């Protein structure tokens, strides 16, 4: 099985995110890049049912699935775009109540940093990406724009 450690990390994180109420059901997704491959949560699988062997593996350059019985998350393009834009090795995309509420506020383009970790790892504020339909190239582009000059 490819990317055993990354798949286990994703499975463990899914359990924590679900237990902490940061995701509900199948909302949100996670990915971890190792070299030319990316492990990503599969589409439509509740986090409580996640197992390493169910995590999809795709090519970093193309997004083509190379392993896993289930198709990758519908936000695969968003993950690949964010990984490329930031140079980071993982993406955690939750649908927490707070994040969903903020994303729904019209006219809000950024939130002030309320914790020093935001400044250490992200920037002086938290940017809000412009709305676009889930899974669309437009949403991936909007996220990349919000991440310009940032690592998170």
Predicted regions mapped to residue ranges:
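Glycine-rich flexible loops
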Residues: 1-152
């Amino acid at each position: 099985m490819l990317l055993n450690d990354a798949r286990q990390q994703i499975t463990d994180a899914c359990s924590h995110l679900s237990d902490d109420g940061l995701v509900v059901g199948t909302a949100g997704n996670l990915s971890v890049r190792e070299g030319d491959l990316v492990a990503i949560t599969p589409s439509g699988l509740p986090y409580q049912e996640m197992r390493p062997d169910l995590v999809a593996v795709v090519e970093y350059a193309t997004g083509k699935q190379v392993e896993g019985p289930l198709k990758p998350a519908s936000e695969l393009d968003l993950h690949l775009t964010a990984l490329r834009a930031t140079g980071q090795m993982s993406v955690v995309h939750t649908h927490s109540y707070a994040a969903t509420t903020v994303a729904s506020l019209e006219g809000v383009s950024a939130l002030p940093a309320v914790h020093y970790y935001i400044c250490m790892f992200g920037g002086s504020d938290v940017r809000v990406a412009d709305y676009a339909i889930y899974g669309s190239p437009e949403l991936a582009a909007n996220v990349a724009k919000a991440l310009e000059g940032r690592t998170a």
